[in-house]
Amino acid sequence: MEFARFGRLTVSAGSPGLDDDVRRPTGDAGRMSDFAMSEAEFRALRERLRRASAWVPADRRGALNNITMSDVVAAAGDVRVGRTVSLAAPIQGPAADNPDPAVHQMAHSAEGPERASGLSFATDRLALNIHGDADSHMDALCHVLFDGTLYNGVADDTATATGAAELSIDVVSQGIAGRGLLLDIPRVRGMPWLEPGDHVTADDLLAAESAQADRISQGDLVFVRVGHRARRRSVGPWDAAGARAGLHPAALELLAQRRIGVLGSDSNNDTAPSAVEGVDFPVHVLAINAMGLHLLDYLEFEDLVALCEELRRWSFLCVLAPLRLPAGTGSPINPIAIF
């Protein structure tokens, strides 16, 4: 299959981490004209992915069906040194990319009037907008409504004002474990991060495979680094809702072919502005609505990158444990990579 349809892709000999026969976008490839996809092309792609990812009509697990018990056992067998690293960012305060921040309040503390001799407790409470542009979270399969349906043809009116009757985050109440694979796109391109508006193509994913001597396999928990957090630390917060790097919609075809289990990014997974005229969040539509693929948004990969570089390996056992929130459309998440 030809994956170079979107973006001017050229051989770049001598680029860090690239073989001469691996193509990557040239420096001007972030321009919208290079990557623009019509709505008709997008809808045709959505239908292909929907058909390719179909399970039985009653299925509610989606791409999680690609992760077998044998896959989990094999991933556990890859633990060699016993080191762990979090893939979540600290919960964020108010900023340009976080206009509706989490509210963390102390309910009881040593400063309160209830303080006395003997036993007392420090307690707190947390209120969080799960689907923002700052905090690490997992999207449930009920999160994306498109053309009147959720994943696998479930009617969108099952997502009610009181919660989701179908496809809620409770689908993953028993957790997810498997082989995690980090694909570090800035490393392959020889830059610290991708600029907002840049697109990760299927060719970028293939180049990362080659550079890291690893391959996206069935059931993998695939993590695509664009360097969002690194850029945020360097230049400061910006309105990520309007401008961010992410996957190009066409790259989902490769991930569907490989039958991955989960997809995550240190950004939103979707590029902004959208590459598809008239369709916002096209990657969310394709991944969640068409493929039944749980997404992890706004993760933190910088500690993970350092450990991967130190150990010279980019795969690991990964464990995801979302909150047990019946009828929830998502959950805060703290993925743990184990090496």
Language-model features: locations:
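Active-/binding-site microenvironments in catalytic and ligand-binding cores
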Residues: 3, 27-339
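Short, Lys/Arg-enriched N-terminal segments with co-localized hydrophobic residues
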Residues: 17-31
